[in-house]
Amino acid sequence: MERNPNPNNLPVELNRTSLYLGLLIVFTTGILFSSYFFN
């Protein structure tokens, strides 16, 4: 593990994880709403 990580590497990783989290949340909420409306 590097003691001094690349400053340009951290925000990209954080952005990618937040993007995947947002997609997952949108996907789960979409499934919940679709089950709500079609039930």
UniProtKB/Swiss-Prot annotation:
The keyword Acetylation is annotated on this UniProt entry: no
GO biological process assignments: photosynthesis
Transmembrane segments: 18-38
Cell compartment(s), UniProt: Cellular thylakoid membrane
Pfam families: PsbL
Signal peptide: none
Superkingdom of origin organism: Bacteria
UniProt KW keywords: Membrane, Photosynthesis, Photosystem II, Reaction center, Thylakoid, Transmembrane, Transmembrane helix
Lipid bilayer topology: Single-pass membrane protein
GO CC, alphabetical: photosystem II reaction center; plasma membrane-derived thylakoid membrane
Similarity field: Belongs to the PsbL family.
Free-text function comment from the UniProt entry: One of the components of the core complex of photosystem II (PSII). PSII is a light-driven water:plastoquinone oxidoreductase that uses light energy to abstract electrons from H(2)O, generating O(2) and a proton gradient subsequently used for ATP formation. It consists of a core antenna complex that captures photons, and an electron transfer chain that converts photonic excitation into a charge separation. This subunit is found at the monomer-monomer interface and is required for correct PSII assembly and/or dimerization.
Subunit structure: PSII is composed of 1 copy each of membrane proteins PsbA, PsbB, PsbC, PsbD, PsbE, PsbF, PsbH, PsbI, PsbJ, PsbK, PsbL, PsbM, PsbT, PsbX, PsbY, PsbZ, Psb30/Ycf12, peripheral proteins PsbO, CyanoQ (PsbQ), PsbU, PsbV and a large number of cofactors. It forms dimeric complexes.
Protein name: Photosystem II reaction center protein L
Organism: Synechococcus sp. (strain CC9311)
